[in-house]
């Protein structure tokens, strides 16, 4: 299926001024389609889920960097590792990053299939054995890799640690001990670069399809999720 037959959402960097001109706004249909067909940037290959701005404000690159998450409720600061991996390493890296979480985990599915603009719906499933979860996720590998309206988070609140595979297909790990996650990334030859910029830090476009929306509903059913919370 061609990109122009998919569903698109332009997403601007946080804090962008209202009325900011999109790099896509004056493109012909042919130029837009040509840009959206490009998946390879040097050695890095994107999935179908997302494409960078036409003017390449951020060039997709493999690597990871350290960051910090501030919880406004608890006023706690949690160390974070954010990573981008090329297509052929991405899903296996995500699966390997789940191992440090332990045997029993909670799962959050994030969807923006039926929402306009910003915002998404989160669906929760508590207490699932990690081997069972992995088996289910492998069945939905193509959708999870290529659907720009689906994200997933897996967490162990007792540790606490969390791994996200978000809508942009970035890998994000939270926890006070990040070494187990960094070890996985190094084993996958994903190198640390704390100056790395991610596709989320500039204008970009998401891609989805009706087929992926249907597969999301099937995944939701397989995980025993009924209702969710909008954000």
Spans of model-derived segments:
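Structured alpha/beta or helical-core interaction and ligand-binding surfaces enriched in interleaved
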Residues: 2-170, 174-231
């Amino acid at each position: 299926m061609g990109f122009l037959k998919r569903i698109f959402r332009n997403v601007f960097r946080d804090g962008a001024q209202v009325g900011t001109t999109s790099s896509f706004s004056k493109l012909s249909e042919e130029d837009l389609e040509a840009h959206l067909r490009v998946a390879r940037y040097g050695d890095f290959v994107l999935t179908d889920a997302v494409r960078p701005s036409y003017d390449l404000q951020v060039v997709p690159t493999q690597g990871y960097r350290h960051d910090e998450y501030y919880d406004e409720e608890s006023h706690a600061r949690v160390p974070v590792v954010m990573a981008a991996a090329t297509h052929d390493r991405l899903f296996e890296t995500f699966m390997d990053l789940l191992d440090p979480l332990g045997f029993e985990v909670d799962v959050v599915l994030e969807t923006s299939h039926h929402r306009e603009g910003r915002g998404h719906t989160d669906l929760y499933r508590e207490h699932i054995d990690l081997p069972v979860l992995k088996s289910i996720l492998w069945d939905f590998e193509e959708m999870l890799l290529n659907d720009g309206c689906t994200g997933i988070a897996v967490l162990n609140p007792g540790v606490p640690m969390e791994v996200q595979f978000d809508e942009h297909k970035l890998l994000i790990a939270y926890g006070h001990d990040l070494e187990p996650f960094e070890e996985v990334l190094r084993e996958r030859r994903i190198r640390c670069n704390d100056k790395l910029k991610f596709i989320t830090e500039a204008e970009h476009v998401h891609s989805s399809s009706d087929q992926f929306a249907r597969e999301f509903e099937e995944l939701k059913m397989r995980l025993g999720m009924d209702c969710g919370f909008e954000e």
